[in-house]
Swiss-Prot record:
Enzyme Commission number(s) of this protein: 4.1.3.40
Swiss-Prot/TrEMBL keywords: Cytoplasm, Lyase, Pyruvate, Ubiquinone biosynthesis
Annotated residues for binding of substrate: 72, 110, 169
Biological process terms in GO annotation: pyruvate biosynthetic process; ubiquinone biosynthetic process
Protein name, entry field: Probable chorismate pyruvate-lyase
Annotated coiled-coil segments of the chain: none
Reaction equation(s) it catalyzes: chorismate = 4-hydroxybenzoate + pyruvate
Gene Ontology cellular-component annotations: cytosol
Protein function: Removes the pyruvyl group from chorismate, with concomitant aromatization of the ring, to provide 4-hydroxybenzoate (4HB) for the ubiquinone pathway.
Pfam families recorded: Chor_lyase
Biological or metabolic pathway of the protein: Cofactor biosynthesis; ubiquinone biosynthesis
Gene: ubiC
UniProt GO MF annotations: chorismate lyase activity
Organism: Nitrosomonas europaea (strain ATCC 19718 / CIP 103999 / KCTC 2705 / NBRC 14298)
């Protein structure tokens, strides 16, 4: 199944604002970058349940349309301001395998876990400018006072024991002030 062009993610953040480009393309831990720029960093869990994937996640996660997977969504907060909306998805059967601890993370950072395990491999980043019709745009903006016209996001797979988790990070307007 091919993803339709409007749903496509791109290998480079072409046309991304200059002040976001560095954030988007940094391959290290986004959690660590934000922590280094904040007095108080916090992970705020907002959703975690078995749910269906977004349509543009199906192919990359090798999921059928109605298959349920574990979806985890959090805000990364800097001094209580949300700066990133993070969305991760892992196949249900992998919760008994490589990703068995994921469902118990609570307000702990997934990024810390991903970047401290040397066995985890990461695929290249993919980028997209999310518009209001994209489901992740809607969820990312749920607690924002002012909705922007669009939001930039990046995603990649983290693979442990041949089992992937897809992590998407949506950059909220406040990230530009860090």
């Amino acid at each position: 199944m091919k993803v339709n062009p409007p749903l496509a993610w791109h290998p480079a953040p072409v046309s991304a604002p200059v002040d976001l480009h560095w954030w988007l393309t940094h391959r290290g831990s986004l959690t660590r970058l934000i922590q280094d720029r904040c007095e108080h960093f916090r992970v705020e869990p907002i959703f975690q349940a078995l749910a269906t994937a977004c349509i543009d996640e199906l192919e990359v996660m090798n999921l059928r349309r109605q298959t349920r997977a574990l979806v985890r969504e959090v805000y990364l907060r800097c001094n209580e301001t949300p700066v990133v909306f993070a969305h991760s998805i892992v196949r249900k059967e992998h919760l008994r395998g490589a990703w068995r601890g994921l469902s118990r993370l609570g307000n702990q950072s997934l990024g810390t876990m991903l970047f401290t395990n040397p066995l985890i491999q990461r695929t290249p980043l993919a980028f997209k400018k999310l518009k209001p019709h994209h489901p992740l745009f809607e969820r990312a903006c749920k607690r924002l006072q002012n909705r922007p016209a669009d939001l930039w996001a990046r995603r990649s797979l983290f693979i442990l024991q041949h089992q992937p988790i897809l992590v998407t990070e949506v950059f909220l307007p406040a990230i530009r002030r860090l």
